[in-house]
Amino acid sequence: MAPGRAVAGLLLLAATSLGHPSEGPELAFSEDVLSVFGANRSLSAAQLGRLLERLGAASQQGALDLGQLHFNQCLSAEDIFSLHGFSNVTQITSSNFSAICPAILQQLNFHPCEDLRKHNAKPSLSEVWGYGFLSVTIINLASLLGLILTPLIKKSYFPKILTYFVGLAIGTLFSNAIFQLIPEAFGFNPKIDNYVEKAVAVFGGFYMLFFVERTLKMLLKTYGQNDHTHFRNDDFGSKEKTHQPKTLPLPAVNGVTCYANPAVTEPNGHIHFDTVSVVSLQDGKTEPSSCTCLKGPKLSEIGTIAWMITLCDALHNFIDGLAIGASCTLSLLQGLSTSIAILCEEFPHELGDFVILLNAGMSTRQALLFNFLSACSCYVGLAFGILVGNNFAPNIIFALAGGMFLYISLADMFPEMNDMLREKVTGRQTDFTFFMIQNAGMLTGFTAILLITLYAGDIELQ
């Protein structure tokens, strides 16, 4: 440490002896110094020697146990003036110089500003690209889950698994928006601005209404008298239903629902789809499309819905990559939080896309290829996000991603989570089981993002 700094520390210590503060912030700063270096609010010669070691006037030995301090944050000159009741235009003279000496001495000894700079240090460019590329690669592997999990779709327990992951996606997306992205867009710091409690209240308001609404529906609903039709394997054997064929709904994604007419039923109850009707929820129009799912048709024979889904999904993944890239430039932990939210959302999203592409006329290989190609646009978004985050203020990207996460979680996935139960709930016990699974998924996602936000300063990715 420079000798000039040691001399400054000694001068400050001498200056404090000129005044005898009995109250106010100067007493708190003095107690911080005396509690660490002295005993019983006094300083012996040996203890003064340790203080001199800390200031660099003597060789330093051992580490300090700071304990509980009154002020353990970085204070600017304006902050020190304000704490002592001085305005920014006040001129410090010998009569009031001793009042601010303990504050300056405390800042010199404990270096809170250096800790703040270390905490706010941005990751290196290689770390940003490395962790960003790894995160996007893991997320893109979710596009392959459609092929792996297709055999499980017909299992009785699969709706419960999918319900949990949809709830998990809602919890992580919503929490990431209110805890990370939107506050970052406004320039808030969770350690300084103390917005976390208010963000928890926002989630609490949403969850409370969800819990009350679902509970009332379970208590007041009369099961077995639904206004929609359940399809069983024996339904397709009656003549009446042969003349009036029903339609079987497929998963709804991006505002589009596919309905397949059951033409041939195998003895085990599995249905071959010879035609698919694509119904857009926006205009209500229906387009027939030939479907031969297990062969490789020409691209011109594939339904328009497949290309619309592929393009929309590519744009969606581009924005996801943009958010990950901008988050990684800010901090690796912020990038991890955003990546977790996107990963949880991609699992049910990509699975639904895969099923729709199959029923639009693509073969399994074609659906897998185009689903993966649309997922690769996330790399392009990652590159743009890193470039913007390193050269410009990324706040606008965080605001855009925060709004997108809120829309996907509340306007897209939340209704889907409720609609997917219509054909599965047969009684109050089943309804309660799915309700608990929904709660488990949402609360798991909420807790994960909350813990990352609260302990962001204590977690280091190296």
Swiss-Prot record:
Give the record's pH note. Optimum pH is 7.5.
Q: Show which residues constitute the signal peptide.
A: 1-19
Query: What's the protein's topology in the membrane?
Result: Multi-pass membrane protein
Residues on Cytoplasmic side: 154-160, 213-367, 412-431
Q: Under the cellular component aspect of Gene Ontology, which terms does the record hold? A: apical plasma membrane; basolateral plasma membrane; lysosomal membrane; organelle membrane; plasma membrane
**What is the annotated localization of this protein?**
Cell membrane; Apical cell membrane; Basolateral cell membrane; Lysosome membrane
| Any one GO BP annotation for this protein | arginine metabolic process
Reported consequences of knocking out the gene: The homozygous knockout of Slc39a8 is embryonic lethal by 16.5 dpc. Hearts exhibit hypertrabeculation and non-compaction phenotypes including excessive trabeculae and thin compact myocardium. These phenotypes are evident at 12.5 dpc and prominent at 14.5 dpc, and embryos that survive until 16.5 dpc display an even stronger phenotype. Ventricular septal defects are also observed. Some 14.5 dpc embryos exhibit body edema, suggesting that cardiac muscle function is compromised. Hearts display increased cardiomyocyte proliferation.
At which positions is motif XEXPHE-motif? 345-350
PTMs? N-glycosylated. N-glycosylation is not required for proper iron and zinc transport.
- Transmembrane portions of the chain: 133-153, 161-181, 192-212, 368-388, 391-411, 432-452
Report keywords, A-Z.
Answer: Cell membrane, Glycoprotein, Ion transport, Lysosome, Membrane, Signal, Symport, Transmembrane, Transmembrane helix, Transport, Zinc, Zinc transport
Q: What induces it?
A: Up-regulated in monocytes upon adhesion and recruitment to arteries. Up-regulated by the pro-inflammatory cytokine interleukin-1 beta/IL1B.
User: Where do glycans attach?
Assistant: 40, 88, 96
Q: What does this protein do?
A: Electroneutral divalent metal cation:bicarbonate symporter of the plasma membrane mediating the cellular uptake of zinc and manganese, two divalent metal cations important for development, tissue homeostasis and immunity. Transports an electroneutral complex composed of a divalent metal cation and two bicarbonate anions or alternatively a bicarbonate and a selenite anion. Thereby, it also contributes to the cellular uptake of selenium, an essential trace metal and micronutrient. Also imports cadmium a non-essential metal which is cytotoxic and carcinogenic.
Q: What else is known?
A: The decreased expression of the channel in testis vascular endothelial cells confers the resistance to cadmium-induced testicular damage trait to some mice strains.
The UniProt similarity line reads: Belongs to the ZIP transporter (TC 2.A.5) family.
Q: What is this protein called?
A: Metal cation symporter ZIP8
List the source organism.
Mus musculus (Mouse)
